[in-house]
Design a protein with these regions (language model features):
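Alpha-helical transmembrane-bundle signature of multi-pass membrane transport and export proteins
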Residues: 1-314
Length: 314
């Protein structure tokens, strides 16, 4: 499982580092002539939203088709192929900033392609777990994968700002570093054990009908999907708005502006680890309402209080 964990870490790191680089480049260009105030905050929000939508929309639109292919092609093959694509995309990001150091259209094109790449990679990385691990180790294996994912989000989000700031007048060096990391992920993917395709029959619409039938028959599955949608929507909105808050309200540098967003991932990653330990060898649904109550409570606190940098980190 080590190869899968490293490949996943590199991919999630690059996704988030590049996404925040694109957002920060957009904010930098849009707010260069603006004084602190509402206009600066609006411009920052617009650029951050643009980066998030450009990454997320292709991911959402291609997720179902990605799941179809993950069932009919060896998941190991999908993982290795997507790691190779990631290397090419990070190289393209490097060329984009070589051509236009301020960002521009091609950085957004690469970001959209990273969204498609992530959509294709995700069902393979999660779907391969039951093929690699016995049932009693699935909860623990999933928690470790989630921990690596959120460690990657944490470090990638933070590194995006630091790499961009460190690159100075040569911003192409930042995605070049991501290209080297992508090469490491590609090498690690070859260590994933071979597995056979899960299915070799049925078309795309057969898969859709099967998925809808499973949803209709399983109430817990419907609740789990609904909960996941709400959770990731809230997480995305919080990360997006914390970045704007850091830049437009706190006036932080590119290097520091991504730190508050990164700490959100610390909490999620630690939560995934705790859930894995509490669940042991079973799936524990009772922990979900407890986690939801915690999210609601701390969001209310954040809404009532306008914290400084230290309070935002907490």
């Amino acid at each position: 499982m080590r190869g899968l964990l490293i490949a996943q870490f590199c991919g999630a790191f690059n996704d988030n580092a590049w996404k925040f680089m694109v957002a920060l480049l957009g904010i930098r260009a849009a707010t260069a002539a603006l004084a602190p105030g509402q206009d600066l905050e609006t411009a920052s929000q617009t650029q951050t939203t643009l980066a998030m939508v450009v990454f997320t929309l292709p991911l959402v639109l291609t997720s179902f088709v990605a799941g179809f292919f993950a069932d009919r092609i060896s998941k190991r093959t999908v993982i290795i192929t997507m790691k190779a694509v990631e290397v090419l995309l990070m190289a393209a990001a490097t060329l984009a900033l070589l051509a236009n150091p301020t960002g521009g259209l091609w950085t957004l094109v690469v970001l959209a392609c990273m969204g498609v790449h992530s959509a294709i990679f995700s069902p393979a990385k999660y779907g391969i777990l039951p093929e690699l691990l016995p049932h009693e180790q699935l909860a623990r294996g999933n928690s470790i994968l989630e921990l690596f994912t959120f460690l990657a989000i944490l470090t990638g989000t933070t590194a995006g700002g630091f790499l961009l700031a460190g690159a100075g007048t040569q911003p192409w060096l930042a995605p070049f570093a991501l290209t080297l990391l992508a090469l490491g992920g590609f090498a690690a993917a070859w260590a994933v054990p071979p597995v056979a395709p899960a299915r070799d029959a049925g078309g795309l619409f057969d898969t859709l009908r099967g998925a809808l039938s499973a949803l209709q028959a399983d109430r817990l599955l419907r609740l789990a999907i609904t909960g996941a949608v709400f959770f990731w929507t809230i997480a995305s909105l919080v990360v997006q708005n914390v970045l704007v808050y850091a830049k437009a309200v706190l006036g932080l540098s590119d290097a520091l502006a991504t730190v508050p967003s990164a700490l959100i991932s610390v909490g999620i990653g630690l939560g995934a680890l705790v859930v894995g330990r509490l669940s042991r060898s079973r799936v524990e649904y009772g922990l979900v309402p407890l986690g939801a109550a915690g999210v609601a409570t701390f969001l209310l606190i954040l809404g009532w209080w306008t914290p400084p940098f230290s309070g935002t980190l907490a």
